[in-house]
């Protein structure tokens, strides 16, 4: 009888302790949430004080994937099927894989100077294998090149353009002095697979990270924040693509005594909250 009574007292005591600890945890959770909101509000206030402006940045949490993809090897049949083109590299064989095409057009293809971007996109879509998978990245007049990046579900797979070894899913058109396309290089990713779904930082989180890391200058403007992917290990045959936010920031600086508008670009890992790259 005494044991049953003692057992009941212990059970009640533990229930009271659980309720007390649960209540304390709830209060702490509420306080943490409020502190987080205060910090977020303080950051936005500080950015405003530094005259850093932005519009339309998404603050809603989203989910996304890391992606795996394989580097495509082009077959002899695929290369021979390209009309009015000839290869500038050795053809594939049993002991020689071709993962980077270098092709020359039989006749140079003229591009309109007025509509060069549209004309170049149309050329890639119609003359190049899987051309619809590529989207214009930039026109480099100094190098006489037009660069396209491969996309996944409509989003850019961002890549370095200053090193051929980082060329994993690109088309580069080469122009002559008459604004004609004479040749191109191509690499392609294939067999895309989504890995486990994970939470992504928001567009606003990515911009605030830049601010935390002192990357945003006073009187600068966040012009855009676009979703895409970056290869984490571009030199491997199987690529792991991480979701990123590509942020464009604009500000003015004096060059030779004159004000000049400068654009700066940042790439932020949307899974790991890290700044991957900065360039102008």
From Swiss-Prot:
Keywords: Cell membrane, Membrane, Transmembrane, Transmembrane helix. Disruption phenotype: Induction of WalR-dependent gene expression. Cell wall defect. Residues 27-280 are extracellular. It comes from the Bacteria. The chain crosses the membrane at residues 9-26. GO terms for cellular component: plasma membrane. The transmembrane region is required for the regulation of WalK activity. This is Two-component system WalR/WalK regulatory protein YycI.
């Amino acid at each position: 009888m005494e044991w049953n009574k003692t057992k009941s007292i212990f059970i009640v005591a533990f229930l009271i302790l659980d309720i007390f600890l649960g209540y304390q945890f709830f209060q702490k959770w509420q306080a943490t949430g409020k502190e987080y909101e205060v910090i977020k509000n303080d950051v936005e206030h500080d950015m405003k004080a530094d005259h850093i402006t932005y519009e339309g940045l998404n603050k809603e949490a989203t989910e996304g994937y890391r992606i795996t993809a394989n580097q495509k090897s082009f077959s002899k049949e695929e290369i021979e099927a390209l009309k009015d083109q000839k290869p500038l590299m050795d053809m594939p064989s049993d002991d020689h894989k071709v993962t980077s095409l270098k092709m020359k057009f039989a006749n140079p293809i003229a591009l309109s100077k007025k509509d060069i971007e549209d004309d170049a996109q149309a050329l890639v879509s119609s003359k190049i294998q899987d051309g619809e998978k590529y989207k214009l990245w930039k026109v480099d007049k100094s190098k006489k090149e037009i660069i396209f990046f491969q996309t996944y579900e409509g989003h850019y797979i961002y890549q370095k353009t200053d090193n051929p070894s980082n060329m994993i899913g690109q088309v580069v058109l080469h122009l002559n002095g008459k604004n004609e396309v004479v040749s191109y290089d191509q690499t392609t990713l294939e067999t895309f697979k989504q890995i486990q779904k994970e939470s992504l930082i928001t567009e606003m989180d990515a911009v605030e990270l830049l601010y935390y890391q002192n990357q945003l200058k006073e009187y600068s403007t966040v012009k855009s924040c676009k979703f895409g992917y970056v290869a984490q290990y571009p030199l491997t045959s199987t690529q792991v693509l991480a979701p990123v936010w590509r942020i464009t920031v604009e500000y003015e600086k004096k060059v030779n005594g004159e004000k000049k508008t400068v654009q700066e670009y940042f790439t932020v890992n949307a899974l790991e909250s890290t700044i991957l790259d900065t360039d102008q």
